[in-house]
UniProtKB/Swiss-Prot annotation:
Pfam families: Bet_v_1 (PF00407)
SMART domains: Bet_v_1
Name of encoding gene: FRAA1B.1
Protein name as annotated: Major strawberry allergen Fra a 1-B
Complex and partners: Monomer.
Length: 160
């Protein structure tokens, strides 16, 4: 088994606490509302929403995939960190066992947020991850993030 790690960093004008509430804590409600073509629904299969929880994410009509399951490892509301693994679903393909994700939102000096993400692809055997697969995932995540950011700018009184 190989492990391929990819890191990404980008910024937002939205303050970290507000962004964390929308992007992590309420994503299961917010994303289907603002991007139903991407995510149809999210449901908790096991747990209470905290560490150890298993969630099923059903993709919308505009997606190439049907569903994935996430296992939450940690949610730190004070330090704005979140980690989970994609453990099941057609987005994994035959060559990937799981994908670990870590997200950290850091308050930026200008009042916005620096978003740091790490993705670790755990492959089956000696399979290498194709760069275009990672790039496509980053582009979808970036688009979804921009939708959330736009929603927060259009609704400044929410998630305070």
């Amino acid at each position: 088994m190989g492990v391929y790690t990819y890191e990404n960093e980008f910024t937002s004008d939205i303050p970290a606490p507000k962004l964390f509430k929308a992007f992590v804590l309420d994503a299961d409600n917010l994303i289907p509302k603002i991007a139903p073509q991407a995510i149809k629904c999210a449901e908790i299969l096991e747990g209470d929403g905290g560490p150890g929880t298993i969630k099923k994410i059903t993709f919308g009509e505009g997606s190439h995939y049907g569903y994935v399951k996430h296992k939450i490892h940690s949610i730190d509301k004070e330090n704005h960190t979140y980690s989970y693994s994609l453990i099941e679903g057609d987005a994994l393909s035959d060559n990937i066992e799981k994908i670990d994700y870590e997200t950290k939102l850091v308050s930026a000096p200008h009042g916005g947020t620096i978003i740091k993400t790490t993705s670790k692809y755990h492959t089956k055997g000696d399979v290498e991850i194709k760069e275009e697969h990672v790039k496509a995932g980053k582009e979808k995540a970036s688009h979804l993030f921009k939708l959330i950011e736009g929603y927060l700018k259009d609704h400044p009184s929410e998630y305070n």
